[in-house]
């Protein structure tokens, strides 16, 4: 999300606190917030999918659900062809 949209979200939030929003502004605010949240969720999901967890001995202890996602995306050398990866 670009900085202009974030500035608009903040502007609408400030206006809502001080004088209230028109129905059109409330709809705009809801759409902008939803877009912001969707982008944030994508970024967090992408970050988590890139994590590989290892214990003190160097063994891969990444949860199986995350390993499956990584296999599907070919991350960390994991492959759908190799269920042990």
From Swiss-Prot:
GO cellular component, one term: cytoplasm
Keywords for this protein: Cytoplasm
SUPFAM superfamilies: YnzC-like
Gene3D superfamilies xref list: Helix hairpin bin
One Pfam family linked to the record: DUF896
Keyword Signal attributed: no
Residues covered by region (Disordered): 62-85
Recorded superkingdom: Bacteria
InterPro entries, alphabetized: DUF896
Record-stated family: Belongs to the UPF0291 family.
HAMAP family associated with the record: UPF0291
Annotated protein name in UniProt: UPF0291 protein stu0508
């Amino acid at each position: 999300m670009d900085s202009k949209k974030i500035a608009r979200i903040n502007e609408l939030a400030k206006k809502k606190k001080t004088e209230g929003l028109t129905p059109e502004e409330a709809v705009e605010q809801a759409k902008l917030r939803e877009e912001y949240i969707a982008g944030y969720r994508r970024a967090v999901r992408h970050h988590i999918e890139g994590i590989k967890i290892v214990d003190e001995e160097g063994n891969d202890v990444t949860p199986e659900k995350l390993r499956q996602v990584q296999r599907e995306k070919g991350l960390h050398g994991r492959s759908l062809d190799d269920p042990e990866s």
